[in-house]
UniProtKB/Swiss-Prot annotation:
Protein name as catalogued: Aminomethyltransferase
Catalytic activity: N(6)-[(R)-S(8)-aminomethyldihydrolipoyl]-L-lysyl-[protein] + (6S)-5,6,7,8-tetrahydrofolate = N(6)-[(R)-dihydrolipoyl]-L-lysyl-[protein] + (6R)-5,10-methylene-5,6,7,8-tetrahydrofolate + NH4(+)
SUPFAM superfamilies attached to this UniProt entry: Aminomethyltransferase beta-barrel domain, Folate-binding domain
EC code(s) of this entry: 2.1.2.10
Oligomer and partners: The glycine cleavage system is composed of four proteins: P, T, L and H.
InterPro entries per the UniProt record, alphabetical: GCS_T, GCS_T_bac, GCST_C, GCV_T_N, GcvT/YgfZ/DmdA, GcvT/YgfZ_C, TrmE/GcvT_dom1
Keyword hit for Lipid metabolism: no
Gene Ontology cellular-component annotations: cytosol; glycine cleavage complex
Top enzyme class: transferase
UniProt family annotation: Belongs to the GcvT family.
Purpose: The glycine cleavage system catalyzes the degradation of glycine.
Gene (name only): gcvT
Superkingdom as given in the UniProt entry: Bacteria
Source species of the chain: Parasynechococcus marenigrum (strain WH8102)
Length: 367
């Protein structure tokens, strides 16, 4: 299969990016080194090419009412200029994908617009399914990225840098807020959301291919560290942010995944999967996603068995060495009875049981 390439591919390669296959794309896994990139984001600012992700625009009459049929979160909690994190469900209450929904307000007297950012691995299937559901309701579903660039600028210096580039104060742009910015030397207005996947403050910017290439070079010239998928993974895992296909999938309910806060059963809306989630809420999950810290230096990886008293009771979904905490961390599913802070478990790593303890998530939170 021929891998797709983003408009920043050549710039990433020229900048020393080591390219690897990911979700049908050839993407940089690292540049200067995972630890260095991770620390750049935690301490200053880093940038990521995330142009492999899907970006859809829904436009038409009452788009929130229409999309509400597909998600369990109350979309009417957000207004124009705001966004929320939520999930798409199947009829069994399993998670099809997670996404961010941006409310773009009214297009005219009769139509509104939403922007959805979806995962690369699910983008084709999501787009087809959403289009099948939305078009009968009179909405158009279009590929907003359309060969363009999605760039994530993350870290404590990211917003001050954007303020400098735009000449605007962003002090009134809250987390999960969004607006259009005019950036110095960039030809077109830039859709900018104060969102991210690192546990740090930051923004995600949607640009044309030419504008994205120019902004990448501007940021490089200002000393911003380019970062790859490796650092993106360690950063999101320290922040205990889910990765679809690893920490949750179509067989996982939001209650099991620790995302029950996204489910608003008080809404009088018969969204996809509602009946299954009502039953799941009543019975309670038999397993839960927990955070683990491991003793020693061995790293737990996806699908490693979790043990209790020598018996396999669960499975690791994601694991890494935490550059910030300087110890191994992991996410894992375990029986609800063992999903308690302080529970002593172990993870089988290369045939040996490594002691582990259930700890509070996230592993890292900016103070």
């Amino acid at each position: 299969m021929t891998l797709q390439r983003t408009p920043l591919h050549q710039l990433c390669q020229d900048g020393g990016g080591r390219m690897v296959p990911f979700a049908g794309w050839e993407m940089p896994v690292q540049f200067s080194g995972l630890i260095q990139e991770h620390k750049a984001v935690r301490e200053q600012v880093g940038m990521f090419d995330i142009s492999h992700m899907g970006v859809l625009r829904l436009e038409g009459p009452n788009p929130k009412d229409a999309l509400q049929q597909l998600v369990p979160s109350d979309l009417h909690r957000i207004g124009p200029g705001e966004a929320c994190y939520t999930v798409l469900l199947n009829e069994s209450g399993g998670i099809r994908d997670d996404l961010i929904v941006y409310d773009c307000g009214a297009v005219d007297a009769e139509r509104g617009a939403l922007v959805l950012v979806i995962n690369a691995a699910c983008a084709e299937a999501d787009t087809a399914w959403i289009r099948d559901q939305m078009e009968p309701a009179g909405l158009t579903v279009s590929d907003l990225k359309a060969g363009g660039v999605l760039l994530a600028l993350q870290g404590p210096q990211s917003i001050p840098l954007l303020e400098e580039l735009s000449g605007e104060s962003l002090s009134d742009l809250p987390r999960f807020g969004h607006r259009t910015l005019s950036l110095k030397d960039i030809a077109h207005p830039v859709f900018t959301g104060r969102t991210g996947y690192t546990g740090e403050d930051g923004a995600e910017l949607l640009l044309t291919a030419a504008d994205g290439q120019k902004l990448w070079q501007i940021l490089l010239d200002r000393g911003v560290s380019p970062c790859g998928l490796g650092a993106r993974d360690t950063l999101r895992l320290e922040a205990a942010m889910h990765l679809y296909g690893m920490d949750m999938n179509a067989e996982t309910t939001p209650f099991e995944a620790g995302l029950g806060w996204l489910v608003h059963l008080e809404m009088p809306v018969d969204f996809v999967g509602r009946q299954a989630l009502e039953q799941a809420a009543e019975s309670g999950p038999t397993k839960r996603l927990v955070g683990l810290k491991l003793q020693g230096r061995a790293i737990a990886r996806h699908d490693y068995p979790v043990l209790h008293n020598g018996e396999t009771v669960g499975v690791v979904t994601s694991g890494t060495w935490s550059p910030t905490l300087e110890e191994p961390i992991a996410l894992a599913y375990v029986p609800t009875a063992l999903a308690k802070l302080g529970a002593e478990l172990s993870v089988e790593i290369r045939g040996k049981a490594q002691p582990a303890c259930v700890v509070k998530r996230p592993f890292y939170r900016r103070s």
